[in-house]
Each structure stands twice: as C-alpha cells, then as structure tokens.
C-alpha cells in the first residue's frame, strides 16, 4: 500500500469515527433540557435552515456549575450543542471562553488550533467542507458566547 493510499484509508476511518460521535450526540443528547434557576439564558436562531437553540448556564463563582440546552434543528446543530454542553460543564469560565474561541477558529479553518484541546469537538471539523453547514455547527457556540456576556465574561 502506498503512502497516499494509507493516508486515504486513515482519513476514511477518521471520518467514520467522527460520524459516529456526531450521531451518538444527536441520538443521545447530553444536558438537553432546562435548568431551574439559570444565571444566564440565551436563544439562538439560524434563519437559513431554521435551527434553534437555547443555552442556559448556571455559574458558580468562576465556573460553569451546570449547563443545559434545548432546541430543534439538523443533526449538526443539535449534536454540536450536546457536545458543547458536555465539554463546558464544570469548567472554569476562562477555559470555556478559550474553548469557544478555539472551536470557532477551527470552524473558520484557522490553522493555529490545537486539535487535542478540542477533544471530541474535532469531530465537527469536517463540517468546514460544507460552508452552509458551518452556521449549524456554530449556532450553539455563538449562543453560548452571548450567554457568557450576560454573566460578564
């Protein structure tokens, strides 16, 4: 097997793994629902395709004590919201802000992003190949950033 063929095989395996991660979050969403007393609530809408998401944060001191989302839309938008809530729950607010910036940079195709800092969120990197879907993947993240502004971050 040539180096090129090996690279193509590995890329196909990675794409399949990423699809599995995205589908798992779509079928088994994490942190979907509402919080009883959120510190911040913000709604986001993608008018191009109708995706909707509401992000709720419970902030305790300098960390996200709990997070929830609800919404409707395509598998990309809803999986991204689930993956986001799983990634930020319990994390310091500064880390959440950095993660959001890194995720957004990855979705813009910037090369200065450390893939290891993103964990499973890297599974959404393939969405960049479909520019119209990037808004689906980033909807929850933009909504999170607005919720963070609501709590002064």
What name fits each language-model region?
Residues 49, 74, 136:
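Functionally engaged cysteine thiol sites
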Residues 71-78:
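Short, thiol/selenol-centered motifs that function as redox-active sites or metal-ligating centers
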Residues 53, 82, 135:
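Active-site phosphate/pyrophosphate-handling residues
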Residues 28-71:
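Structured beta-strand/loop patches that form or line metal/cofactor-binding pockets in enzymes
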Residues 80-92:
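Alpha-helical support elements that line or immediately flank enzyme active sites
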Residues 78-79, 98:
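Alpha-helical macromolecular-interaction surfaces
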Residues 1-36, 91-153:
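C-terminal binding/interaction regions
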